[in-house]
Structure formats: structure tokens, C-alpha cells
């Protein structure tokens, strides 16, 4: 990534995080923007979202993000329009890195305990 795309990605991540904090329903799962990757032409921003909640809540929130992409882009545009000629299209992806890290941690703990302790 070039310095420009990194700066744009950082700005988008910061602004989208603020939008998520203020605009998403409070009763739902906790959602955090973990990473934003922007294409070289600044036309598409891939937004990775970490969601803490049940599988059903995750699916519901991802569906919400996909259906409300245009509305979220419009809110984003109102916040940063003076910095860009054209706001990138937003694509949302679920980031399961936190979940995978927890699973690896559990596996490591079970290996450290050994098979004799697991049988107790």
C-alpha cells in the first residue's frame, strides 16, 4: 500500500468507528472496525468488522451493514467530503481473527495441561 492509501484507510477506519459508535443499535452485538483496506485507485474500501455476539447476532449485523451500505457511505460522506472528491464504495467483511485467536489459545492451554489432566 502506498502512503496515500494508508492515510485514506486510517481516516476511513477512524470515521467509520465513530459512525458505528453513534449510529448502530445499542441493543445489538458489539462491533468494531478492525481494518480498512483501500484499492490503489481509492474506489473501493474493504471494511473488516469484528463482532462480539452470538452467531445469529453476527449474521443479523452483517446483513444490516450490507443493506445499509449506501446510508453509511452517505453519513461518511457528510463527515469527510471536504477531504475527498469521491467517497470510496464500502464493502463489509466479518473479521473473525479475535475468535480464531481465542480458539488457538484454548488449544495451547489444552496441550500444556496434558492428556492426564484433561481426563480428570
UniProtKB/Swiss-Prot annotation:
<dbReference type="GO" id="GO:0043024">
    <property type="term" value="F:ribosomal small subunit binding"/>
</dbReference>
<dbReference type="InterPro" id="IPR015946">
    <property type="entry name" value="KH_dom-like_a/b"/>
</dbReference>
<keyword id="KW-0963">Cytoplasm</keyword>
<dbReference type="GO" id="GO:0005829">
    <property type="term" value="C:cytosol"/>
</dbReference>
<keyword id="KW-0690">Ribosome biogenesis</keyword>
<comment type="similarity">
    <text>Belongs to the RbfA family.</text>
</comment>
<comment type="subunit">
    <text>Monomer. Binds 30S ribosomal subunits, but not 50S ribosomal subunits or 70S ribosomes.</text>
</comment>
<dbReference type="InterPro" id="IPR023799">
    <property type="entry name" value="RbfA_dom_sf"/>
</dbReference>
<comment type="function">
    <text>One of several proteins that assist in the late maturation steps of the functional core of the 30S ribosomal subunit. Associates with free 30S ribosomal subunits (but not with 30S subunits that are part of 70S ribosomes or polysomes). Required for efficient processing of 16S rRNA. May interact with the 5'-terminal helix region of 16S rRNA.</text>
</comment>
<protein>
    <recommendedName>
        <fullName>Ribosome-binding factor A</fullName>
    </recommendedName>
</protein>
<dbReference type="GO" id="GO:0030490">
    <property type="term" value="P:maturation of SSU-rRNA"/>
</dbReference>
<dbReference type="Pfam" id="PF02033">
    <property type="entry name" value="RBFA"/>
</dbReference>
<dbReference type="InterPro" id="IPR000238">
    <property type="entry name" value="RbfA"/>
</dbReference>
Amino acid at each position: 500500500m502506498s502512503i496515500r492509501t494508508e492515510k485514506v484507510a486510517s481516516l476511513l477506519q477512524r470515521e467509520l468507528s465513530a459512525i458505528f459508535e453513534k449510529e448502530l443499535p445499542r441493543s445489538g452485538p458489539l462491533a468494531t472496525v478492525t481494518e480498512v483496506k483501500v484499492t490503489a485507485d481509492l474506489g473501493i474500501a474493504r471494511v473488516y468488522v469484528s463482532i462480539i455476539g452470538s452467531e445469529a447476532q453476527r449474521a443479523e449485523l452483517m446483513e444490516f451493514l450490507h443493506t445499509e451500505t449506501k446510508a453509511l457511505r452517505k453519513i461518511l460522506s457528510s463527515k469527510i467530503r471536504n477531504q475527498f472528491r469521491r467517497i470510496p464504495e464500502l464493502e463489509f467483511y466479518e473479521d473473525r481473527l479475535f475468535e480464531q485467536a481465542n480458539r488457538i489459545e484454548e488449544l495451547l492451554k489444552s496441550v500444556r495441561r496434558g492428556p492426564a489432566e484433561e481426563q480428570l
